[in-house]
Regions:
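Short, well-ordered beta-strand segments in beta-rich or mixed alpha/beta enzyme
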Residues: 17-24, 63-101
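Residue-level signal for secondary-structure boundary sites
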Residues: 28, 91-93, 133
Length: 133
């Protein structure tokens, strides 16, 4: 991958990212897809990049590596999901946070999300800043 392509990708995703890892019962897959679509449409209107992933397998590829499904105690009846929200910079992240808190649609979406994740669990969240390496 050339430097110009890498730079273009990096500029497109910004320098700040929030990640959310959570377990969803397989029976809630379609409802969670719909919820992520609704949330994504709203949050993209705030100018962020929102990506959603589902874990493909639960096998560790080699000794010394633990699959995330094991780390968060996912069962065979559950899927492991990952959501990433990219912001241009910390100021943009703060601005989006204010918009989310003031958006009346967010409360019901949050409530629905808590009903869809595995009972007794929630979201594992991390806020990251990109390192320039």
């Amino acid at each position: 991958m050339g430097k110009s392509i890498t730079t273009e990708i990096e500029q497109g995703i910004g320098s700040e990212v929030d990640h959310f890892v959570y377990r969803v019962p397989k029976k809630n897959h379609d409802l969670t897809m719909q919820l992520c679509k609704e949330f994504g449409e709203i949050i993209r209107s705030y100018g962020v990049v929102h990506l959603v992933f589902r874990l493909n397998n639960t096998e560790a590829p080699m000794e010394g590596i633990t699959n995330i499904a094991k780390t968060i105690s996912a069962t065979q009846d559950e899927e492991v999901w990952l959501e990433l929200i990219f912001y241009r910079d910390h100021k943009h992240k703060d601005e989006v946070g204010v918009k989310m808190r003031n958006d009346e649609r967010m409360g019901p979406l949050w409530q629905r999300s808590m009903e869809l994740v595995t009972q007794g669990t929630g979201f594992i969240m991390g806020e990251f800043s990109r390192l320039k390496v």
